[in-house]
Amino acid sequence: MKKTLSIAALLCGLCVCANAASMVTEWTGGAGPTEGNTYELGNAGNWSNGIPSRGNGQGPDVIFNNAGTVNVNGAMVDTSDGGGITVTGNSNVTVGGTRYTGNVTVGSGSTLNLGQVDFKSSDITLDGTLNLTVCGIDPGGNGARLVFGIGGIINVNQKIWGASSFSVSGLLATTSTDLTVGEFQFVTRTLVTSAGFDGGSISLGDFTAEDGSALAKASGLMEGNAADYQGQYYLYTENGDVKVQYVVAGAVPEPATATLSLLG
């Protein structure tokens, strides 16, 4: 069985101390929509533990799990200073009003849509899609770390300001059963799309294979025979985007699980 390293495990080795959240509350949608897929953020009936709120200078942890497609209408409080927003379980969530944002986690198959966001000492952990209109850094924090899982991407409509306070790292799927064993292929994946960078360049960090094995940084874009570059990747910026080129190797398909019939 193939071993896969989670981005949560990757983050664990990088974590920094942070304040605890003021509260934890999960979206239920129990009050029902006002129209179509639009719900009121300020209706306590839509939350498991009350409307998200700050306390003692700390932001809340706001969770959307298996929420479906929802447009949450209203002004979300700032989740910075210990809080954050988590979207998982194939949810497609649009939240208005939030600005000073703590941690963000978007799981595989899920999408989070936000407007203007100022990150503050934030871990942005992406296996899914994060769409932002405006994105920057609160100068009172310690920047933001973008940690990408196998399928994560962040799309920003405008320039990323305070870009030098962002760092990029994550996981790459370096094997595929779509290729035969002994076959190698270059893959280029887009991690960040934006209109450009203000305030310096994004810090380009380290990437790891999905099984946890180390990968080496290539000195430039790789060309020619992909087999000559096994275990390497090249992370770079291009016209406001962040991309990573890496090598995928053919893998043996996992055997089908045998099932014993009670009928013999």
Where are these regions (language model features)?
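Extracellular, surface-exposed repeat/solenoid domains
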Residues: 134, 139-245
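Right-handed parallel beta-helix/beta-solenoid
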Residues: 20-46
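Repetitive helical segments and hydrophobic/amphipathic motifs
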Residues: 11-12, 263
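Acidic glycine-/aspartate-rich tracts in secreted/extracellular proteins
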Residues: 31-34, 51, 68, 195-199
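Short, threonine-centered small-residue motifs that mark membrane-proximal processing/anchoring sites
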Residues: 6, 17-22, 244-262
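Short hydrophobic/aromatic-rich beta-strand motifs
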Residues: 2, 25, 62-63, 85, ...
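Bacterial N-terminal signal peptides that target proteins for export
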Residues: 1-7
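Beta-strand repeat architectures
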Residues: 23, 48-157, 164-180
